């Protein structure tokens, strides 16, 4: 899913960096899934962190966004030090959740709209997430590893 989002953004002209290492204000190591640099706005950069969660009745769009902002906003100064060519940009953290059963929230739809990505890719991404979830379950059930 992360690689697909990276590819879609790259096709739109964004410069994307994958698995960006950084350190937060407390010295904890973090890894940003996608650092995307906007080609059309010299003032914007995006820290994009998609995640897969089991769907609940909670507002997962809001929960994931708050969680990701809490994790990655304290890393922005370190990212600016590591990438001085982007130091003058305003950074925005975007947390995206994909449901482990193939669902998506409004946040994903809004992300596709904001970045002018074709929505026809959403079902393929959701299907990939679902297939990966099934594969993980299969490995847990049929693993030869005994505790």
Regions found by a protein language model. Name each.
Residues 2-52:
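Active-site metal-binding core of divalent-cation-utilizing nuclease and nuclease-like domains
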Residues 1, 27, 64-68:
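Phosphate/oxyanion-binding active-site loops and adjacent basic polyanion-contact surfaces
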Residues 32, 38, 45-46, 50-147:
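Catalytic cores of nucleic-acid endonucleases
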